């Protein structure tokens, strides 16, 4: 039976440390603040906003919300971002993406108007560059950093280990590979054009699955003693939920097949996702510390 790498334990430890850092900042007259920019009333955005606000309040970080209409113009949204850049009381900004459909073609341009020093969710090119250069140009993406927090909390040493990342997105796969390399792991990144992903995955000491495909990580992809970080959040219409009905979130892994084989695994839900929000708030705290 695999050890469960539970996000709630990681989050509890992170929150305690962050609360102490916030207290130290406030003693110096600095009150960390997160700006949340939302266009419209997307239910998933509202859900994440609620969770992020609650986590921020728990840690002691202020939240200021900027709610714009779904049909907001490109110019109006950029003006809002520039106003946040100019507001010294705001230390970090979370803007929900994807942006409304009429702004899709301009999303990268709009995102890059945010100052990297306030880019706590890694939506600018400069923040992404920081991940690849190892320089503190902005902040790393929250989800892959949450993976690293889990590895650190559970004392999993990456030095000299073979690490395989399934997925090459700029949001998770690529930065996760760079972060693992920074921990002195030897990386392999698999994607949709990779030949024999299962064979490559079986040779990993640390396997990060960020494919975003339900039930894609079967017993054929894993081997004894592996550390499996299941990043993805998928909808499984057949999975029994907390109310006893059908329909619940699940990761890439066929948990019933993979869990008996590997050494440790993050469950979904209850794994990486639960840590990500504390990483976001931690970035706000760090952004505030950088102003001292």
Enumerate the predicted regions with their spans.
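Anion-binding alpha/beta catalytic cores of soluble intermediary-metabolism enzymes, centered on
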Residues: 92-158, 215
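Short beta-strand segments enriched in small/hydrophobic residues
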Residues: 31-40
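Positively charged, low-complexity intrinsically disordered leader regions
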Residues: 1-30
């Amino acid at each position: 039976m695999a050890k469960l790498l539970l996000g709630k334990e990681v989050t509890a430890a992170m929150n305690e440390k962050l609360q102490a850092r916030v207290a130290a900042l406030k003693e110096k007259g600095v009150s960390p603040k997160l700006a949340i920019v939302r266009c419209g009333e997307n239910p998933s955005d509202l859900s994440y906003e609620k969770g992020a606000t609650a986590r921020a309040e728990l840690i002691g970080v202020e939240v200021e919300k900027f709610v714009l209409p779904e049909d907001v113009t490109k110019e109006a949204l950029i003006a809002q971002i520039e106003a946040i850049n100019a507001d010294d009381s705001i230390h970090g900004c979370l803007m929900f993406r994807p942006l409304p459909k009429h702004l899709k073609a301009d999303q990268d341009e709009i995102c890059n108007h945010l100052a990297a020093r306030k880019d706590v969710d890694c939506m600018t090119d400069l923040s992404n560059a920081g991940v690849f250069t190892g320089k503190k140009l902005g902040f790393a993406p929250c989800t892959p950093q949450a993976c690293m927090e889990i590895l650190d909390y559970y004392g999993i040493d990456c030095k000299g280990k073979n690490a395989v990342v399934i997925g090459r997105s700029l949001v998770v796969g690529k930065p996760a590979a760079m972060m693992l390399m920074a921990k002195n792991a030897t990386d392999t990144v698999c994607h949709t054009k990779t030949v024999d992903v299962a064979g490559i995955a079986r040779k990993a000491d640390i396997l990060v699955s960020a494919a975003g495909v339900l039930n894609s990580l079967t017993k054929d992809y894993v081997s004894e003693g592996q550390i499996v970080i299941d990043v993805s959040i998928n909808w499984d219409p057949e999975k029994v939920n907390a109310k006893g009905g059908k329909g619940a979130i699940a990761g890439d892994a066929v948990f019933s097949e993979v869990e008996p084989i590997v050494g440790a695994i993050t469950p979904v839900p209850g794994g990486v996702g639960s840590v990500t929000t504390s990483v976001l708030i931690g970035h706000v705290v760090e952004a505030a510390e950088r102003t001292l």
